[in-house]
Structures are given as structure tokens and as C-alpha cells.
Amino acid sequence: MRTAYRIKPRFGARAWWAIVGVAVILLGAPAVINAAVPDAAPVMSRVELGSEDYGWTVGMRDRDGSELVCEQHFDDPMTERWTCGQTEIRTTVVENAEDQDLALRRIIRGVGVGWRVLDQNVPLRHRAEARQIEDTAADATAISLEGSGEHRDQTIMVVVSGPDRMKYSDLVWHNVTSGGRS
């Protein structure tokens, strides 16, 4: 003779509702706390191309010589990021880039503007150790500055995207190719 043995739960509806209530409290508490805590004030700081971690930065100055100050974001450990109005400036330093032109083409994808392949026929603008390329489909401009001296194997990479991309990419180009460099 076979007997089927089943363990029946020892608690009823009240216990189930208690478990559901605890789950709602645990899952809902972060949302309530987030709503109660005010948003942090934006951090305004001077835009500096490059990276202090590598000991190489180029301070951005406006055409009138004043420091360019924008809202800085700290959400990406690989790049420094500022928002100037609705335009974004991202910068990083890469090491040992053997093909500077290819590195510049790749950086547009690398900082999150898009994963599409940039047309190889898009011309690059060169001036001494600086390069610039525009990706109009992604509304982005990438600019690089190849290092020399103690920064010989380093390259500052900058990607500018957004509605005022041309204004800020021209400003970056001016700073990396002229006396704006520090």
C-alpha cells in the first residue's frame, strides 16, 4: 500500500499577507527614501581635457581668455565628462596608440556616442600633433592631441556631442592647437 505524504503549510492567509507586507516595505523603502532626499546641486568646475590620473591636462579657456566652467559629472570611471548647456564634452587619455588616426576613429564609438562604424572616407583634420574628425550622423566631433616629452606615449582624446557641438569642438581645437594649452 502506497501512501502519499505531503507537508501542508502551517500558516494561513495572515502569514502570507505578512510576508507580502514585509516584501513591499523592503522593496519600496529605497523609492521612498530617494523621493525624500533632495537632489545634489550640480558640480560646476573648470573643463580640463586629459586626465589628472595620468598627470596631463589641458585647461579649457574661452576665446576671451576666461576659464570654461561647466557642470561636471562623475558617472564614468573611464572618462571625464562635462555638460555645457546641452552639449557634452568627454575626455580621456589613451596610451600607446600606434595608429593615431584609427584611434581617433574608434574613440567616437568608445565613449558611447554610437556603435556604428564611421565611414573610412571621412577626412581627418591635422595640425601638428592634433587631429579632428567629425561624425555628422552621430552629431559628434572627436579631437586628439598626441603627447610629447614626458607624455610621449599618451594621447588626449576628446569627444564633443550635442546641439552646440560645432561651437565647443572649435573651442577644443583652438585650445589644443594654440596658446590655450597649459
Protein language model features and the residues they cover:
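Compositionally biased, intrinsically disordered low-complexity regions enriched in proline and serine
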Residues: 6, 55-57, 169
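C-terminal region of N-terminal signal peptides and the immediate post-cleavage residues
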Residues: 26-56
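A generic structural signal for solvent-exposed, polar alpha-helical segments
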Residues: 22-23, 62, 121
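Proline-anchored loop/turn motifs at beta-strand termini and strand-loop-strand connectors
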Residues: 53-74
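Polar low-complexity intrinsically disordered regions enriched in Ser/Thr and small residues
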Residues: 15, 24, 31, 53, ...
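Hydrophobic membrane-insertion alpha-helices, especially the h-region
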Residues: 6-36
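Conserved polar/disulfide-associated segments of primarily extracytoplasmic proteins
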Residues: 3, 38-44, 70-155, 161-182
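Intrinsically disordered regions, especially transient/low-confidence alpha-helical propensity segments
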Residues: 13-14, 53, 63-65, 79, ...
